[in-house]
């Protein structure tokens, strides 16, 4: 089973234990072993941190799904991209639509979608949460747990 994530750029540190316990439940009780996470904002960073920790204890795989090809500056790129992937076909998408394309791709792959959405106004996270619900994905909202 596959899980992906959408959340606001700014998130309180207090949700990290809830995120961790939610992921452990998905791994232990719902056979989730593959995770796709973006690389934009605080929620994504928190998810990556927790997944890295859990990957040391559980047989799981996670990938950071990029919206753009990484750019090299000065000819040398010291960044390790071994845990990243690009969605198939994204190279043909105009840059201004790349994040939306990436997010839709992540939803299509997922069985579960974990979100942290506390407001809808101008929120891409809220938009993609609604899309996941419309595609009948199992959506777990962390904002109101605990």
Show which residues each predicted segment covers.
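Acidic/glycine-enriched connector segments
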Residues: 2, 9-146
